[in-house]
UniProtKB/Swiss-Prot annotation:
GO cellular component: ribonucleoprotein complex; ribosome
Record's keyword terms, sorted: Ribonucleoprotein, Ribosomal protein, RNA-binding, rRNA-binding
Coiled-coil features, chain-numbered ranges: none
Record lineage: Bacteria, Pseudomonadati, Pseudomonadota, Alphaproteobacteria, Rickettsiales
Designated name of the protein: Large ribosomal subunit protein uL4
General function of this protein: One of the primary rRNA binding proteins, this protein initially binds near the 5'-end of the 23S rRNA. It is important during the early stages of 50S assembly. It makes multiple contacts with different domains of the 23S rRNA in the assembled 50S subunit and ribosome.
Stated family: Belongs to the universal ribosomal protein uL4 family.
GO molecular function terms listed in the Swiss-Prot or TrEMBL record: rRNA binding; structural constituent of ribosome
Subunit-structure text: Part of the 50S ribosomal subunit.
Location of the region described as Disordered in the Swiss-Prot/TrEMBL record: 49-76
PANTHER family linked: 50S RIBOSOMAL PROTEIN L4, LARGE RIBOSOMAL SUBUNIT PROTEIN UL4M
GO biological process: translation
Length: 204
């Protein structure tokens, strides 16, 4: 598979070869759904907590005798039926992460890249070695591409990162950090030639 090779100014500088095993994978949206749920679950802090009957401060004394009052028997004022009592089966601090097979995660990355390629939303860059230090300069470069949001994947320098940091529609990521959620969350995915080699070693 052959596609145009461009620079950040959208000037054609040659052609690049795309591996069909990565960019022509069979579309299974259910796998993308599973992977996105898995990624979002990993991001959850899990710091939710309510106080149960053992956490609520208060007396441990039995409020009144078991018999002869005519009222329902009670053993603690910290019980959930009382005002200020504990919460039954409330959330506790825990991890929301769960395991997902490596093969499924690899296949999901192929599906996401193939989906973007089918929709003409993949751009191959020759490199990220461009003399851009200001946000205004980066904005001019990005305006050459007619998309609403960009995920730039490659080995970028500090100057490029600083120039793009204040653009909410541009995100930079290293090849090792490429993931399904970020791919689907941006309209256009920009990959460098070195990133293509990294993907072949990672996914094949």
């Amino acid at each position: 598979m052959e596609c145009n090779l461009v620079n950040l100014s959208n000037d054609n500088v040659g052609t690049a070869q795309l591996n069909p095993l990565i960019f022509s994978a069979k579309q299974k949206l259910s796998i993308l759904h599973d992977i996105v749920r898995w990624q979002l679950a990993k991001r959850r802090a899990g710091t939710h907590k309510t106080k149960g009957i053992s956490d609520v401060s208060g007396t441990t004394a039995k409020p009144y005798g078991q018999k002869r009052t005519g009222r329902a028997r009670q053993g603690s004022l910290r019980s959930p039926q009382f005002r200020g009592g504990g919460i039954i089966f409330g959330p506790v601090v825990r991890s929301h992460t769960y395991s997902l097979n490596k093969k499924v995660r690899k296949f999901g990355l192929k599906i996401a890249l193939s989906l973007k390629y089918l929709n003409n939303q993949v751009i191959i860059l020759d490199n990220l070695n461009i003399d851009v230090k200001k946000t205004s300069e980066m904005c001019k470069c990005i305006k050459n591409f007619k998309f609403s949001s960009f995920l730039i994947v490659g080995d970028y320098g500090d100057d490029l990162l600083r120039a793009a940091k204040n653009l909410h529609y541009v995100d930079l990521i290293k090849p090792i950090g490429l993931n399904v959620f970020d791919i689907l969350n941006h309209e256009c995915v920009m990959l460098t030639k070195d990133t293509l080699k990294h993907l072949e070693g990672r996914l094949l």
